[in-house]
From Swiss-Prot:
Subunit composition and interactions: Each stator complex is composed of 4 MotA and 2 MotB subunits. 2 A subunits and 1 B subunit are thought to form a single ion channel, so that each stator complex contains two channels.
Family membership: Belongs to the MotA family.
Keywords carried by this UniProt record: Cell membrane, Chemotaxis, Flagellar rotation, Hydrogen ion transport, Ion transport, Membrane, Transmembrane, Transmembrane helix, Transport
Protein name: Motility protein A
Its job: MotA and MotB comprise the stator element of the flagellar motor complex. Required for rotation of the flagellar motor. Probable transmembrane proton channel.
PROSITE patterns per the UniProt record, alphabetical: MOTA
Chain ranges on the Cytoplasmic side, renumbered to this chain: 205-254
Bilayer topology annotation: Multi-pass membrane protein
Top-level taxon of the source organism: Bacteria
Keyword Cell membrane: yes
GO cellular component: plasma membrane
TM spans (from-to): 6-26, 32-52, 150-170, 184-204
Amino acid sequence: MDVGTIIGIIAAFLLILISILIGGSITAFINVPSIFIVVGGGMAAAMGAFPLKDFIRGVLAIKKAFLWKPPDLNDVIETIGEIASKVRKEGILALEGDIELYYQKDPLLGDMIRMLVDGIDINDIKATAEMALAQLDEKMSTEVAVWEKLADLFPAFGMIGTLIGLIQMLRNLNDPSALGPGMAVALITTLYGAILANAFAIPVANKLKKAKDMEVLVKTIYIEAIEKIQKGENPNVVKQEAAIMLGVELPEEV
């Protein structure tokens, strides 16, 4: 688990809360109708922008933002190097006993190793793996898009709520004493929208995008590495190319 997102979001809300408490009573910043407009309206509009199944999956993907663990890039490189070395020394069938281990490291890698051991043509293996990767990319991109849409809609509905409040306030211009409190209530929805977007939805969307980009990159490297390994390329070269793609500097002796 990468705790950065959890710490960041909690810290943002705490700092806002502390600032409110220092300036006065927190009750002045609580308005239930405003919450309904911003949260309910934003969620409803986002639901209308996606197929229901995609929207639900996207919202539930919030767990990934908090629980996703970045892959160990050095382990990815070492795994590729080990596979390449074993194939070069003992042949492809030597990988059969380690298929379950490769599945644990990455399901797509496990699938490719299994197909390789089964003697399936490398072009078919690559095509199947790329198709699976494209489906994963599309799925994770939709999850990111849901949260990016929420980040856009929360402030928009905050403004809608503010306009509603202003209209209601202007209907009571005959009572000047009510203008100040009315304006304050009207602006609360804008505040809610800004907070939810910038302190919550945007961080979640960015974390999901980071997870997607890293997952796609690692799996792409596995696909290219397996192709090179099957063609008998030098293990050190395969390993070095993977390290370059991942931005990892290998020891000079490798």
